[in-house]
């Protein structure tokens, strides 16, 4: 058994197993695309404790129509944090032996952290009804930094929505997933030269592209556009869990 416990192998193996269950048709029924029913629905109709006071639009907290504001990331309606993060580290993390230190968050991880690091107000959006740099009034936010993600049970408990900028007690992101990492770890899937598994088809693991949608998408955020594990590899905020078990 390779060295583990909060290392990447445990995470990677679990993710691959989960994706394989989906591929076999067992887990698909437990999730459905319905962001309005999730805690990521921050509109006034949201079922969570963090939601708008009056704003009824569901998508506007993250997304904006094409060309609604010049000079911003297409379809993204929030500023990105300029914080420097302390990445996850562990003596049992094989990726540290290869990368020396994990890269700064990139891709979808930066998008997630624009809310979840707690440095930016949840209601601050780039465009709202044609008005740039608008603020949506929110309820249920932090008592320490009003408007930002609430602390929940605390960053040291592992049960918080507010991750902060110190990611050492979270799980690895910005991990470059290569055959070298898989070989060193011993439990990860051995991707091919295009970072795909199964080799050639990459139905489960790979970098998303036109006509190619792996179930665990790596993101081309690494050096030389190598595929990396980011938040969006495993997490989709648009999916509603429908299985109470």
Language-model features and meaning:
Residues 24-60, 64-245:
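C-type cytochrome heme-c attachment and multiheme electron-transfer modules
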Residues 12-23:
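Bacterial N-terminal signal peptides
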Residues 2-14:
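Bacterial N-terminal signal peptides that target proteins for export
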